[in-house]
A protein has these predicted regions:
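Short acidic, glycine-rich surface-loop motifs adjacent to enzyme active sites
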Residues: 173-191
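Outer-membrane beta-barrel translocator/channel fold
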Residues: 189-199
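N-terminal active-site segment of His-dependent metallophosphoesterases
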Residues: 27-88, 156
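Active-site glycine-centered loops adjacent to acidic/histidine catalytic or metal-binding residues
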Residues: 49, 75-76, 105-106, 183, ...
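Bacterial N-terminal signal peptides
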Residues: 14-22
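Extended active-site neighborhood of metal-dependent phosphoesterases/phosphodiesterases
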Residues: 64, 83-178, 197-202, 212, ...
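A short C-terminal boundary segment appended to hydrolase-like catalytic domains
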Residues: 261-333
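Bacterial N-terminal signal peptides that target proteins for export
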Residues: 3-14
Length: 333
């Protein structure tokens, strides 16, 4: 156990050294500003495919007990076209001012718009938090929260030109941490019964921009290795410490929010972890902890189920917009 702790500290020290100017004097001022926006050990929960009732409530209680400071919900809310009940469930457990960011799923489309629709409830929450966003929220939108750049699109559900929007938004933002969120998948980016719904272009634009890809739709959990190409399923590294760059990233689906659990139908060497009914899965959430111990470009992720079991754990280091010190480090190798 002590050895594992030392190894993790060593990884974070290496990540930190990549950021030190002069190693130190040439870090960009804008990058330093971005660093300061993410509090140390800032925890985000990633969920999807939720529903109403006991299972969904258990996952939200897990989010609360783990000390998550924000939720990213990748679509499919209550499955009953009842925005008021869905919002009330969140408020009852997490509170009406909890940072809860959600993108539209296929089961949310019918009641998405309007003054009593899902989108309006989500906008009201953002307004209470004084969080500004660009675009059509939850459909084709972006926002900055605690130094993390979040893009939410809806390929296969609502709107169009989502890949173009991802490319444009990623090109003009200089955050270390960027997350591209949507609900549906390509068939080979899930392991159950879902079809090719999104097109590869959204995956590839997110990869080129060095963004983590967060999806759901498959009612199970899985994550890829570090990828050079999603379209051709090309693995760049199988290390459990994932080093993100512009052109290399990973994707996951986290759809165990409470509705149901699917069995596994597909597999492939690009998967680092698969957790479905076939593996005896329980409902749960993926948690990402950013700025680990004050190292701005270090994060650690773990998937925990409502039984208290951690079924996946991995570290992530971002080399996206971490400043010229990274280039100095590379040139010295």
């Amino acid at each position: 156990m002590r050895g594992h702790l030392y190894m993790r500290r060593w990884k974070y020290l290496v990540a930190f050294l990549l950021l030190i100017p002069g190693i130190v004097s040439t870090l960009r001022a804008e990058t330093s500003a971005s660093f300061s926006k993410t509090p140390p050990n800032f925890k985000v929960a990633f969920i999807g495919d939720q529903g109403l009732g006991e299972n969904a409530e258990a996952v939200l209680n897990l989010v609360r007990s783990e000390g998550a400071q924000a939720v990213l919900h990748q679509g499919d809310f209550d499955y009953e076209n009842n925005p008021d009940a869905w919002n009330a469930q969140i408020n009852e457990i997490l509170g009406e001012d909890f940072p809860y960011f959600a993108s539209v799923g296929n089961h949310d489309v019918e009641k998405w718009n309007g003054k009593d629709g899902y989108q309006q409830y989500l906008k009201n929450r953002l307004n209470r938090l004084d969080v500004e966003w660009d675009g059509d929220y939850g459909v084709k939108s972006s926002l900055q929260y605690k130094g993390i750049f979040i893009i939410q699109v809806s390929p296969g559900d609502l709107g169009s030109f989502h890949a173009d929007y991802l490319r444009e938004q990623l090109a003009k933002n200089r955050s270390i941490w960027r997350i591209c969120c949507w609900h549906k998948n390509m068939r080979l980016m899930q392991v159950s019964k879902k079809a090719d719904d999104t097109g590869w272009d959204v995956y590839e634009e997110a990869r080129k921009g060095g963004a983590i890809i967060a999806t759901a739709h498959d009612h199970s959990y899985g994550r890829t290795h570090l990828m050079d190409s999603f379209e051709y399923q090309t693995v760049a590294s199988q290390s459990n410490t994932i080093v993100i760059t512009e052109g290399r990233t990973f994707a996951f689906f986290s759809g165990l929010g409470g509705k149901s659990i699917y069995g596994q139908e597909l597999s492939g060497p690009w998967w680092a972890k698969i957790y479905t009914k076939t593996q005896g899965a329980h409902y749960g959430a993926l948690f990402g902890v950013f700025n680990v111990d004050g190292v701005p470009n270090a994060a650690t992720f773990y998937f925990k189920n409502i039984k208290g079991e951690v079924v996946d754990r991995f570290d992530v280091i971002s080399r996206v917009h971490t400043g010229s010190a990274v280039e100095q480090h590379r040139s010295s190798q």
